[in-house]
Amino acid sequence: MPHRYFTTEISDGTAVLRGADAHHLSRVMRGRLGDTVILCDGSAVEYTATITGFGDETVEFSVEPGYPSAAEPTVDVTLLVGYPKQDKLEQVIRHGVELGCDHFVPFFSRYCVAAPKKEEQKNERYNRIAFEAAKQCGRGILPDVALPLPNFGAVCRSLDQYDLVLFCYECGGAPLRQLLAEATPADGKKLKIAIITGAEGGFAAEEAEMAAKAGAKTVGLGPRILRCETAPLAVVSAVMTLTGNLE
C-alpha cells in the first residue's frame, strides 16, 4: 500500500511536500523518482502522486485527478470529553481518529480530577497525535483538537451548532438507535453529531440538567460502568455502526 501524506500544495497536476514529511519520504523511506504515494489535501480528497523531483526539504510530484476519500464517514462527529488524568486523553484522540471522529473538544467540569496546566503546549501534542493517527489509519481529513473549555457551561453554550447532541450519563437515557433514526441534518448534508462524555468523576446532577436545557439528548451506555477513556470510544463505535460506517 502506498504511503500517505497531507499537503495543501496541490494544483494543476502538480504537488509539493515540505518539512518533516518531505524529510521522512526522501531520507527515511528513501523515496525514488517514479515512486507512487497517496496525497491528501485535508478536505477528504485524495490524489495518486508520482515523485518527479527532490529539493532541500521538499519533494515534488505529478498528480492524477483527485477522488473522494473512502475513509471518511457519512456523519460528522465531535467528541466533547471531560478532561481525564494522565495520558487518557491521548488514547481517546488516537483511537477516536481511527474510528472516524472529526473534532475533539476537552472540557473541565465539576468532578474533573485533572486541573488546567500548560494547555497550549499540550494542545500542540494532541493535534500532532491526531495528525499521525489520521495518516496511519488512512483518513482524508485532518481531525482537530481544540483547547479545553473552562467549564460545563461553556460546553452547553456551544451545542447549538449540532444536529444531534448525545449526553452520555450513567443514570441512563433514550436508546441510541432511536435518537439516530430521528435526527436529520440541518444543511441536508452530513449529520453533525456531538457526543459528550465525562471525566473520572462523571457529571453532577446540575450538569445533566444544564445539558438537557441546552438541547442534549441523554443516552445510557448499558448496565456497566465504563471508564472515562472507554466510554467515548464505545459511543463512537456504536454511532458508526448504527449509521453504516463500520460495514
Residue ranges of each PLM-predicted region?
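Hydrophobic side chains in well-ordered alpha-helices
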Residues: 25, 89-92, 207
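N-terminal positively charged helical leader segments and presequences
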Residues: 1-68
